């Protein structure tokens, strides 16, 4: 995975790019469909033009900004903007994740550093799934990416 985290004036820009063995349709289905969400982010689902995040006593509806099948999905993420871009390259699929997140992002569950760490862990898991590899140890992945984010934003 190629990872870049840049500090802008008011935001952080996180970019993660990686090739996967899975074809474009399989990659899209995992990352941008309700059936796929159940495999890597079961709290998410798409309803019409909304992305729904739901767990126990919490429900958040976020605007689906772009949905171009097999190309790009982008959505509001509680004030941040998240997108996945899909391409065919050299006999594999290529995925680019981007998040533009306000430096002052935060709610009762998260802040900018935790959110970016979470997306780094999720993308590491997506890479493993789409390459038919064993999932990483989540705690180890979280520790690794927490340290990376902390170093980048200090």
Give the predicted meaning of each segment.
Residues 8, 67, 85-89:
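Short beta-strand micro-motifs enriched in acidic
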Residues 128-154:
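Short, highly charged C-terminal tails/helix-capping segments
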Residues 11-13, 50, 70-72, 90-94:
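A generic structural signal for beta-strand entry/edge sites
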Residues 19, 25, 35-81:
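Glycine-rich portal/gate segments that line the openings of hydrophobic small-molecule binding cavities
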Residues 29-36, 69, 121-128:
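Short, intrinsically disordered, mixed-charge
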Residues 15, 52, 107:
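Conserved short-loop catalytic and cofactor-binding motifs
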Residues 1-43:
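Hydrophobic ligand-binding cavity/cleft-lining segments
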Residues 76-128, 139:
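Beta-strand/loop substructures that line and gate deep hydrophobic ligand-binding cavities in soluble
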